[in-house]
């Protein structure tokens, strides 16, 4: 809905909320945008910079360019980096399995590398930040049963019956 309204009006409303809340800036996360929304998101980012002024921070979450899997093409990275203080790049979570067993980390290193390589010529590196998950993926009897938080993983690591494994093939750690 943030992209359906006039970008100036949306920016005005968001900047007023930042001001009245006494916040240092705004972190805007509009996930999985399509190519049809690219210009609208860029216009909103530019309007937000104008409304927030230079004394407030503007962080924009963007989906990473992908090597494999579904791509969300609603981000003009170069144009978005102009009004943004930071572009926070989200690498999609993956759940690759083989014979009902997870075989890849949630943020595969090759996807992280690809995304950063693609953005290197488009965005100043000082403007880029990378978002990686700190959760784990829980599996029971070959079925994905949910997520495990960082605190839950730490608790599992301290349990004497927990065994940890690492596979070089998939650059991924496992607990059983």
Regions found by a protein language model. Give the residues of each.
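Gly/Pro-rich active-site loop or hairpin
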Residues: 98-119, 174-176
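Active-site region of glycoside hydrolase catalytic domains
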Residues: 95, 114-141
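Short alpha-helical interface patches
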Residues: 77-83, 111-115, 151-165
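A sequence-level detector of short, solvent-exposed, charge-rich linear segments
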Residues: 33, 99, 103-107, 127, ...
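Chitinase-like catalytic core of GlcNAc-active glycosidases
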Residues: 1-108
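Active-site glycine- and acidic-residue-rich loops that bind
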Residues: 64-71, 108-112, 135-140, 146
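Glycan-binding loop/region signatures in secreted carbohydrate-active enzymes
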Residues: 1, 134-176
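Structural alpha-beta junctions
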Residues: 52-56, 121-128, 158-163
């Amino acid at each position: 809905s943030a992209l359906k309204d006039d970008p100036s009006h949306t920016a005005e409303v968001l900047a007023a909320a930042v001001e009245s809340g006494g916040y240092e800036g705004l972190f805007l996360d509009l996930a999985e945008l399509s190519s049809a929304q690219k210009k609208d998101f860029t216009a909103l980012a530019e309007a937000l910079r104008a409304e927030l002024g230079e004394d407030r921070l503007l962080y924009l979450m963007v989906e990473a360019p992908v090597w494999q899997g579904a791509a969300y093409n609603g981000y003009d990275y170069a144009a978005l980096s102009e009004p943004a203080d930071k572009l926070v790049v989200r690498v999609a979570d993956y759940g690759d399995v083989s014979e009902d067993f997870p075989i890849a980390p949630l943020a595969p290193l090759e996807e992280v590398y690809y995304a950063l390589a693609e953005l290197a010529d488009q965005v100043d590196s000082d403007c880029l930040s990378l978002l990686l998950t700190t959760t784990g993926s829980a599996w029971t009897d070959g079925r994905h049963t949910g997520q495990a938080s960082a605190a839950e993983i730490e608790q599992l690591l301290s349990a004497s019956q927990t065994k940890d494994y690492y596979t070089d093939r998939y650059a991924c750690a496992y607990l059983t």
